[in-house]
Amino acid sequence: MNSTNPMTGPKVLHANLKRGRLEVEVNASTFAAQALFDFAERRNPKRAFLFVSRVLGRHIPARPSLMAQSFNALAGKIPADLPGPVLVIGMAETAVGLGAGVHRALSQTRNDCVYLYSSRHP
């Protein structure tokens, strides 16, 4: 994951799936989109695809140092002078781990961080 060359123009990523072609247009990104995620197929009539993270280690193995780098990069986007407390929310599935990692990284520099998570299941 290298942020020294942020993306400046639109880039179209695509995947040829059994149920059709999926295209994603990325207009701006600090990191190269293909370094962050890939596409996967699902056997689900409501949504035949899944975006899988290359940096979270859930579906594709990732080095812990890469995971920490992504959490630190996201936490670094939160203004240091933001009035607290700061609430970080992980909403269902993969975002629960992402939120926990961002909270942990943010807690290195702030003592007023709170983390909440939710599930899509009751």
Give the positions of each predicted feature.
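PRPP-associated nucleotide enzymes
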Residues: M1-P122
